[in-house]
A protein has these predicted regions:
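Glycine-rich phosphate-binding loops of nucleotide-dependent enzymes
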Residues: 1-243
Length: 243
């Protein structure tokens, strides 16, 4: 039986946007689920902040990683929760928001109002708006605000602009670049060639569960990158050495 992901090995560096590019169904989802802890992996090692987190819980991985998931409804938000509840999903146990087993509602409200203003999250009833009633673009803004504000060294962003309008896409792109410029490592998974070429500092192409090429976006054309993504070309890890 073939593994969904096979011998994938790379480093994500501080201060860069590393993009994993590929056509849907070539192992990207399985890889990200193994990295973030949504699914267990059959083997291999994941090292983050100098620690082996290969068998760590999602919560422990979250100590060094923020995750903007591919499916914002399934993995990003609890749709029947309010906006403010969603904004503290990973942080409600922190002393800032909890004391003696009780949530500090005023602190949660103040935090939510700050993020709403800073990230221009638009919702009919402000912090108490049900997430389900918000537009896709504002749902995504909420997820990005929550994950970025956690201030972790690695940001994993999977299809962060899927289903968004042009204005929302531009906002997402600006935020990812801002985080890169602030010294974060940004791991971007995208199917969109234009997005890959415009945002990436380094590109890894995944095809049938393997990395088939590593490229500098300044040294490859959109057309050639498309050939690698479709499996028509293959390179060794070093740029330009075709196999």
């Amino acid at each position: 039986k073939r593994n969904a992901v096979d011998h994938v090995s790379f480093d994500a560096r501080a201060g860069e946007i590393l993009c994993i590019a590929g056509i849907d169904g070539n192992g990207q989802t399985e890889f990200i689920h193994a990295l973030t802890g949504l699914d267990k992996s059959n083997g291999g090692t994941v090292t983050l902040c100098g620690k082996d987190i290969s068998h760590a819980s999602i919560r422990r991985r979250g100590e060094c990683m923020s995750h903007i998931p591919e499916d914002r409804h399934k993995h990003g938000l609890v749709l029947d929760f309010t906006l403010e509840q969603n904004l503290v999903l990973q942080r409600y146990k922190e002393p800032e928001f909890e004391k003696g087993g009780f949530i500090k509602k005023d602190a949660v409200r103040a935090y939510a109002e700050r993020l709403i203003e800073e990230y221009d999250i638009r919702s009919g009833q402000g912090p108490v708006t049900t997430a389900r009633s918000m537009s896709g673009g504002n749902q995504q803004k909420a997820i990005i605000a929550r994950e970025v504000d956690r201030n972790k060294p690695l940001i994993v962003a999977v299809q962060p602009t899927r289903g968004l309008d042009v204005g929302a896409i531009e906002n997402v792109h600006k935020e990812l670049v801002k985080q890169r410029d602030a010294g974060k490592a940004v791991l971007l998974v995208s199917l969109e060639l234009d997005e890959v070429m415009s945002l990436s500092d380094r590109i890894l192409v995944m095809y049938e569960g393997e990395i088939v090429g590593e490229f500098d976006p300044k040294q490859i054309t959109v057309q050639e990158l498309g050939l690698y993504m479709a499996g028509a070309k293959r390179a060794d890890k070093k740029e330009g050495e075709t196999a």
